[in-house]
Amino acid sequence: MDKRWIGILIVLIAGLGCMYLIVSNSNSVGSAVSVINDVTITLPPGYITSEDTSNMCVLHNKQTNETIRIRCLDDGADYINEYNNRLKSLNGEDDIDIQKNFTNKTLSMIKYENQSSTDKKDITLVFFEKCKHTFSMQFEHFTNETNQEKMMNFIIDTLKYDFKQNTG
């Protein structure tokens, strides 16, 4: 075998190794995606899309009954204003017990308990901006707060601008 063929085999093996590492560490390669306006979202493992419109997507985990509602708000909406408006409306209701609320540089979050409802007892609302859009996420039926934060970070990290939707 010629030295050129050995070099070609080494480059080929290195290329295949790099492709394997890229695919194994990617959140979107080989995963299901959904589109909200012109932004794609990668579905977390174990979740399916139970409702899908142009500006909203509902993700559901059948094993744990956890539900995530992701909504793209109006184009001119500011996530801090949306957060303040929602917090003000929740404070006005008697049967709502707000457990946690905060705002940082990337998102605003309200965690509350609805005393009068048996179906949606613990609800967490998250408002944030990404890809020139304002989004709200609503988490329902989550019993593990660590898992909820993990799903929230996964969704925010995998939101990507979908260039295929805007080809003109």
Report each predicted region and the residues it spans.
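Surface-exposed amphipathic alpha-helical segments
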Residues: 45-47, 135-168
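Secretory pathway targeting signatures of secreted, lumenal, and periplasmic proteins
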Residues: 36-85, 113-119
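Signature of long, low-cysteine stretches enriched in small and polar/charged residues
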Residues: 88-135, 142
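Sec/Tat-exported extracytoplasmic proteins
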Residues: 51, 87, 91, 159-163
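Hydrophobic membrane-insertion alpha-helices, especially the h-region
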Residues: 5-22
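Short, hydrophobic/aromatic-rich segments at coil-to-beta transitions
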Residues: 28-32, 54-57, 103-113
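Short, Lys/Arg-rich N-terminal segment immediately upstream of the first membrane anchor
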Residues: 1-2
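Ser/Thr/Pro/Gly-rich low-complexity linker/stalk segments immediately outside membranes or between
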Residues: 24-38, 42
